[in-house]
């Protein structure tokens, strides 16, 4: 009989997939396991990636607020966990409804011991949104 042992790596891969599918795809911010003091860097944040947003509720209000009306379908492609099991990346495609385009995204998440996201950085070319 094969054991169904769930490893930390398995949990991190699932977190990345759930972020894409249950968070962005289902338009459910509360499905994303952000720590209260999370830091987010994203090209479409006010000030871009060089100006991080701090705090879960601040991210909900500034970054997340327009997303449910802008995001269409998402397609999870793959994830990667680093050797130290402290970070996971998710590769996915995100359909944007206005202007119509598909963003090819890789997001990196740093995870704490409680399994919460403490840092997130989004990597993608924003030109399809900013210069359609």
Predicted regions and their residues:
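A solvent-exposed, acidic/Ser-Thr-rich amphipathic alpha-helical stretch
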Residues: 28-86
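Short glycine-/acidic-enriched loop or helix-start segments at secondary-structure transitions
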Residues: 9, 50, 129
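A structural signal for well-ordered alpha-helical scaffolds and beta->alpha junctions
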Residues: 13-16, 56-60, 102
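A beta-strand edge to alpha-helix "cap/lid" segment located at domain peripheries
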Residues: 2-6, 61-132
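Residue-level detector of alpha-helix boundaries and kinks
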Residues: 1-4, 15, 44, 48, ...
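Short acidic-aromatic low-complexity motifs
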Residues: 2-37
């Amino acid at each position: 009989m094969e054991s169904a042992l769930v490893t930390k790596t398995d949990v991190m891969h699932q977190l990345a997939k759930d972020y894409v599918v249950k968070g962005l795809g289902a338009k459910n911010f509360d499905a994303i396991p952000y720590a209260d003091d999370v830091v987010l860097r994203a090209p479409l944040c006010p000030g871009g990636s060089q100006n991080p947003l701090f705090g879960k509720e601040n991210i909900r209000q500034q970054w997340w607020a327009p997303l449910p009306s802008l995001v269409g379908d998402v397609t999870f492609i793959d994830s990667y966990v680093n050797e130290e099991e402290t970070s996971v990346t998710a590769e996915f495609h995100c359909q944007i409804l206005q202007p119509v385009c598909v963003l090819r995204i890789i997001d990196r998440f740093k995870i704490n011991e409680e399994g919460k996201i403490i840092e997130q950085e989004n990597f993608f070319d924003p030109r399809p949104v900013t210069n359609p």
